[in-house]
Structures are given as C-alpha cells and as structure tokens.
Swiss-Prot record:
Protein name: Membrane-bound lytic murein transglycosylase C
Species for this entry: Haemophilus influenzae (strain PittGG)
Function: Murein-degrading enzyme. May play a role in recycling of muropeptides during cell elongation and/or cell division.
Gene3D superfamilies: 1.10.530.10
GO biological process terms held by the UniProt record: cell wall macromolecule catabolic process; cell wall organization; peptidoglycan metabolic process
Lineage: Bacteria, Pseudomonadati, Pseudomonadota, Gammaproteobacteria, Pasteurellales
EC category name: lyase
Name of the gene: mltC
Membrane topology label: Lipid-anchor
Leader sequence residues: 1-15
Amino acid sequence: MKKYLLLALLPFLYACSNSSNQGINYDEAFAKDTQGLDILTGQFSHNIDRIWGVNELLVASRKDYVKYTDSFYTRSHVSFDEGNIVIETQQDLNRLHNAIVHTLLMGADAKGIDLFASGDVPISSRPFLLGQVVDHQGQQIANQVIASNFATYLIQNKLQTRRLQNGHTVQFVSVPMIANHVEVRARKYLPLIRKAAQRYGIDESLILGIMQTESSFNPYAISYANAIGLMQVVPHTAGRDVFAMKGKGGQPSTRYLYDPANNIDAGVSYLWILQNQYLDGITNPTSKRFAMISAYNSGAGAVLRVFDNDKDTAIYKINQMYPEQVYRILTTVHPSSQARNYLLKVDKAQKKFRVRR
C-alpha cells in the first residue's frame, strides 16, 4: 500500500516545485522533490491508515475526484467514469450533511484545491456538477438551499452504514449521476474545444474522444505519471514540447495545466505537433490519425518503432499499408497493452462524438 501511495503522491509533490523552477533540468528537479517525499507520504499515509485502515486507500486519479475533510474523517468520491458519488464520514451526521452540500456545489476550478489538506472545498455559484446530478424531486442542484434540502433527504432516507476492518463505523450516502452525465460535462468544454480545433486544425471529435478517454472530462484529473487535467498533459514531455513550439522556455506548471483553457490548448497543440512534425511524413489522413492517437498515449517514437526502428523506414512502411492494416498493427503489435487499448477506446469515442455532432 505504501508503494502505491508513493506513486500516487509523486505527481503532487513534483507539481509543488515545478511552477517556480521551470528552468531547472527535470532530473535535478525530480531528485530535489523526492527529498521531501518521505515526509509527505508518511503524513498522508499515516492519516489514511490510522483513520480508514490499510485497505481503504482512496486517492484522486484520472477519472476520480477524491477529497478528504474533517481532519480526514470524512471523504467525498466522485467517479466520473462510473457516474456515481459516494460521500462518507466517521463523524456525526452534521459533517456528512456539510460534505454532501460542498461536494454537490464544488466549482470547476481545480487550481485552488489542495487535495492533501482536510478543509472544505469552497461552494461555487456555478457548480461543476450542475446538470449531472438531480435531487429526489428531479430538479437540478443549483444553489445551497436545494443542496441542503437534498442532503437532508439523503440522510433521512438513503443513509447506509458499514464497518471498516479497523472496527470504525462509517455512515455514507451514494448518489447516482444522470445517464448522460459524460455528455453534459463534454458540453461544458465545447467552446474551448472548438476554439482550439479551429486554431490548430484538429478534428473536434478527435479532441473529444481523447478527452473522454483521458479524464472523462474531469477537470481535477491527475495520474501517477504526472499527467494533469482534462487532456492529461505531462508537463516535462508534451508540455515542454508545446512550450518550445510557442517559443517559451521550461514547462507548464501544474497550476497552469489545471486551467481548462490552458489544458485544452496544450493538449491540442501537442496533437498539432504530432500531426505536423513527428508524424508529418504519413500521407494517408486516416493512418495518420491512428498514429496520432497512439502517439498521444505512448509517444511518436514508440509508435514508429512498432513498424521499424528507423523513423524514415517506419513512415515508408506505414505509407505502403491500408489504414485498416495500420490500425490492426497498432492495436495488436504495439508492445504496450495500454497503448493498444488506448487506440481502441479513443477511436470508439471519436466515432460516437462524430455521430452526435
């Protein structure tokens, strides 16, 4: 468990320093960051182990928002992939009520949220979950009055109890999101997506397909590989390439990438780099699209090496194939199972968004 937590915390620790040390070599910055890792890991792990038990580790990820409050005795978990919200506490029901209200009314701005502090998430006048969850009367949860009434209803009618392995009792409620919650989230970002699509000449549906696969449109998304935000941009790789293309030095900070406009622009900029620089020699548009999708996940070099170790020879071989052959090879021969599945998922998601446009 400690090893897993270490991996989960690495991105956050690295993020703490990269916004102020962008001129530092990545390896040097990484080494400096890890010096304080034992302290941060120990503190967070100790809180979770002591309060929830060693088998109850729950941390934020690409498609999961997780926030601890009340000195870590209360936590909220929004699964954007499964479309379900679970809010639970080991304290009194007033704390559960408070957590329900704050979760339902949290905003979309991830920049100011400290996932390792145990304070409440601020209530927003523009709740991010608006339109994705309805109360017991079927109305949208747009303000504190509606959220408070719904929280009271949930506690009075839907309260559940479970016992942890450490003997602690947990009281919790589970709130399903509406059936088309993914599409509702996607619509929130359409203006930004369209702007970036037009600016860089990238298909709108491709951006949507990648964003759904990467984060399920979760603005708080972060991965163990330090991929940040909606399009899961890795600061020291894709982020650095994007900054170089824009004539900037260094790499984007975590705070920069948690801004949806910046994140989408960076992600689509990287698609432009893949399309017009790293994979420019591929002539068939469909074959190039398949290669771009796979490269967004595993890197252009890894994609080309599937066909040949020499870049020019790899591109030549791709150009001799039908797109269906390129797709089959990338989804069956690529050495990374994640990359193989990634192309399948993005292609499926992109087709779905094409139909709905």
